[in-house]
A protein has these predicted regions:
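Short, structured active-site-proximal loop/turn typified by the sulfatase FGly-forming signature C/S-X-P-X-R
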Residues: 155-190, 198
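Catalytic-site neighborhoods of secreted/periplasmic enzymes
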Residues: 205-207, 213-267
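Composition-driven, intrinsically disordered low-complexity tracts enriched in small residues
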Residues: 1-140, 432-555
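Polar, surface-exposed loop/tail segments
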Residues: 412-443
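Metal-dependent active-site segment of extracytoplasmic phospho-/sulfohydrolases and closely related
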Residues: 145-146, 165, 320-366, 406
Length: 555
């Protein structure tokens, strides 16, 4: 089933915040990660004859829930000493903005040289272009799972008691209510930051058009791990094409990539396919072989675009992901019970939040994020596993810390250009609420969320302008990508050619404005003028599920 990026337009009112610290802004933006049935990348191939089935949809009340105890990780090892913690737990908006818009001339990108099939020594790994060096060579296999839930408000996780599995991970791990104020709240730039450790301004991204050359310059975590040790099994399972494209980018892509297009005209059903495939991947993990899994869910974000983040539909989409997380964690715990000497570390994060009110629509979709309201810039990180304190809070964590953390867990020193730090190095800022239990954690995280605000006036206007301008080439790209998705080759190429011309006619001016508004790493003239790229790992459409016959109930 082909898909295209959903589009939306909206009006963002930043408002007036004390002495002109922010201004009212009116903007037009793109919706982010969800893809409609209009079409996806033209070369996405449906191969094979069978695929995982989505689970039967049940109400949260009817779904078997798991207690915190059932989801808890094995006994944690002693906490690592904080060696490079951030200086403060609460940075002013002005300081964050200054950091976000500063130049990055000292950053040295990596090159991601191919090492497929080559067993690397520690010295060889230290010499590779991604600047990651070996700190330890552990003989114990390492297993790490990162779960990405797009467009998710931490407040929505905390407020709904049906989100029992994510709340259990919070209760048995260390959690941050963090902010990315001063950085764009678009998915492609944000997930690139999460998966490379480099902020989008440095990487040169500001909209959702995938640019493969970005990851030749800034290697992904998959590139870094595969360069260090090709024996690490790297797996990516997602239902947004950009994630599959990022996983396949660079000279050393992830070992296994599965991309699920929209199924049954339902992102909840599609998220279920991602969840089941993730359970299968964990169950099939080979003992004695290190593994890194990245599981990505798009349904929450896409539902927020269609309705809003305060709607019952958004809450239901999040609860559906929560149920999938419960099944994934059950698989992790079962695997851990069978292999107690090889515990898993589980990290959960999001790329941005969403506004919980209706905004202007384009078609069926709304502008739900892309600007600088606290709803959009508030993010979260949950860290669960050995070395992370149970029931703790650490608001110095950020989603930019994910790649450095994974590097460190596998024995690598993160590249010198990384904007983040390993979460283990920030342990000095851990704290626990005075009162025990989840309610106290919930209140402490809610209080942290309430502290976050807008950037200063100049930054707010600059980022809004960047979002508006970046929407134009993205809109052109998406329209032509959707038009040509199911066309036959003779007609497809000339229409794509026209689309490429129009795209670059809007993209190059947008790149200039992006540079002027703080995107220091972009290329005004792209190295490849053809914007259409393949989507690796596209999965076949499962057989349609039968619609049950309604049964009359006597009352």
């Amino acid at each position: 089933m082909s898909r295209a990026k959903q589009l939306c337009v909206g009006v963002a009112a930043a408002g007036l915040v004390g002495l002109g610290s922010t201004v009212a802004t009116v903007a037009v933006a793109s919706a982010d990660t969800g893809n409609s049935d209009a079409g996806s990348s033209s070369s996405a191939v449906k191969a094979g004859s069978s695929a995982a089935q989505p689970k039967a949809r049940t109400s949260p009340q009817a779904k078997a829930v798991r207690t915190n105890e059932a989801l808890s990780q094995p006994a944690a090892a002693s906490r690592k000493t904080a060696t490079a913690g951030r200086t403060t737990t609460a940075t002013s908006a002005a300081e964050l903005v200054s950091l976000a818009l500063s130049t990055v001339g000292s950053a040295t990108p990596g090159t991601g040289h191919s090492r497929r099939g080559v067993v690397m020594t520690a010295s060889a790994a230290a010499a590779t272009g991604n600047n990651a060096t070996v700190t330890t060579q552990s003989t114990t296999p390492t297993h790490v799972l990162v779960i990405g839930i797009d467009g998710t408000n931490l407040s929505a996780i905390l407020s709904n008691p049906d989100n029992v599995n994510l709340q259990a991970l919070i209760s048995t791990g260390t959690t941050a209510a963090s902010t990315m104020v001063g950085h764009t709240t678009m998915s492609n730039p944000s997930w690139t930051g999460i998966l490379t450790g480099v902020w989008s301004e440095t990487a040169g991204l500001f909209n959702n058009v995938f640019t493969p050359w970005t990851y030749d310059k800034w290697p992904t975590i998959f590139n870094q791990l595969e360069t260090y040790d090709p024996g690490i099994q790297t797996t990516v399972i997602a239902d947004w094409e950009n994630i599959a494209q990022i996983a396949g980018a660079g000279s050393i892509p992830a070992d296994s990539i599965k991309f699920f297009p929209k199924y049954n005209n339902s992102w909840l059903d599609t998220d279920d396919l991602v969840g089941q495939a993730s359970v299968d991947a964990i169950n099939n993990t080979t003992a004695g072989v290190s593994s890194f899994n990245f599981t990505y869910f798009v349904g929450v974000d896409d539902t927020g675009h269609e309705y809003d983040a305060g709607s019952p539909q958004y809450a239901a989409a999040l609860t559906n992901v929560d149920q999938n997380v419960g099944e994934i964690m059950a698989a992790v715990n079962t695997w851990n019970a069978a292999h107690p000497d090889e515990p898993w570390t589980v990290l959960v994060t999001t790329d941005h939040g969403q506004v919980p009110w209706p905004t202007i629509r384009l078609g069926s979709d709304m502008r739900a994020h892309g600007f600088q309201t606290p709803w959009e810039t508030t993010t979260f990180v949950i860290a669960n596993g050995p070395g992370f304190e149970q029931g703790a809070i650490n608001n110095t964590y950020s989603n930019i810390d994910i790649t450095p953390t994974v590097d460190a867990l596998f024995g690598l020193t993160p590249p010198s250009y990384s904007a983040g730090k390993p979460l283990m190095d920030l342990a000095g800022s851990d704290y626990k609420p005075v009162a025990p239990g989840f309610d106290a954690i919930k209140q402490a995280l809610t209080d942290a969320i309430a502290m976050y605000g807008y950037p200063n006036v100049v930054t707010n206007v600059a980022l809004d302008l960047r979002t508006i301008v970046g929407f134009v080439p993205y809109f052109v790209y998406t329209v032509f990508n959707g038009l040509t998705a199911d066309m036959s080759a003779p007609l497809k190429l000339p229409i794509q050619f026209i689309g490429a011309l129009l795209y670059q006619a809007t993209n190059i001016p947008a790149q200039i404005i992006a540079r002027l508004t703080g995107v220091t790493g972009n290329q005004i003239i792209p190295p490849d003028l053809w914007p259409y790229t393949t989507v690796p790992g596209t999965q076949p459409e499962p057989p349609a599920t039968a619609v049950p016959t309604p049964v009359a109930i006597a009352v």
